[in-house]
């Protein structure tokens, strides 16, 4: 049996601009800003040679359909041109569906682990591009993998997959702590398919990215994230109440993750 392991951080998007017009899927993505966090997903893959491909995915030990992960496995096995029974075990340390980049982390860590296990010899960016493609096709993310591949507090200046899109980093102290809590899910696929939400994002997202580039700080990122969340209208009363309480206690410009009740 062949085994390999890889890690990918979680990621919180504060605001973004949809950039999915290009025909080339590697040029599709988003401009935006957010932060990668230490907690994420550790993925272990196990492979046994077989007469035909079979894929099993476990999330924290529980069998799951996991279409994004299975899509990554399909891409990687096609490159290997061999058949295997593949078991993928995601050790997930972040909430799923809460806007903390679980789908991107699962996709990227799976691709990294399979690149090792299958001895494909792909570069880091080429591996990340596979995860990016799968996210775009499944409508589970636009720029998350680009951000996760770089880490830190980022501005996604140019859309596209890793190696094509461009990320610049906002300098922060090494002891900076991100405080977040999650109370529910918002399905990214539904949000990206909602024309009304898309129109609101397109109206404001790009302007906020340009504003942050001019004045790049984590304080400005949080301020613009809050403005974005308020203007696209996704904050429910529970989120608004929590943010007010946080601000009363010194957490200035607390905001909402895109997309999740986080």
Residue ranges, per PLM feature:
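C-terminal nucleotide
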Residues: 165-262
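A generic local secondary-structure boundary/capping motif
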Residues: 2-3, 31-34, 98, 135-137, ...
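Short, hydrophobic/aliphatic alpha-helical segments
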Residues: 82-94, 129-134, 239-249
């Amino acid at each position: 049996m062949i085994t390999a392991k890889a890690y990918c951080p979680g990621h919180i998007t504060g605001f973004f601009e949809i950039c999915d017009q290009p025909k080339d899927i590697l040029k599709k993505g988003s401009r935006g800003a957010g932060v990668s966090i230490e907690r994420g997903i550790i993925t272990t893959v196990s492979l046994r040679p077989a007469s035909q491909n079979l894929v099993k995915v476990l999330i924290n030990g529980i069998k799951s359909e996991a279409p994004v992960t299975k899509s990554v496995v399909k891409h990687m096995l096609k490159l290997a041109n061999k058949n295997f029974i593949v078991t993928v075990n995601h050790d997930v340390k972040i909430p799923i569906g809460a806007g903390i980049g679980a789908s991107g982390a699962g996709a990227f860590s799976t691709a990294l682990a399979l690149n090792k296990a299958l001895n494909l010899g792909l570069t880091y960016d080429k591996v990340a591009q596979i995860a990016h493609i799968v996210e775009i096709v499944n409508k589970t993310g636009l720029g998350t993998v680009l951000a996760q591949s770089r880490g830190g507090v980022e501005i996604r200046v140019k859309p596209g997959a890793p190696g094509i899109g461009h990320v610049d980093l906002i300098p922060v102290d090494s002891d900076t702590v991100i405080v977040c809590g999650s109370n529910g899910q918002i399905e990214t696929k539904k949000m990206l398919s909602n024309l009304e939400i898309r129109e609101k994002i397109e109206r404001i997202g790009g302007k906020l990215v340009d504003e942050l580039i001019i004045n790049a700080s984590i304080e400005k990122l949080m301020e613009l994230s809050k403005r974005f969340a308020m203007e696209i209208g996704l904050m429910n009363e529970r989120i608004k109440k929590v943010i007010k309480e946080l601000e009363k206690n010194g957490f200035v410009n607390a905001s909402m993750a895109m997309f999740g009740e986080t």
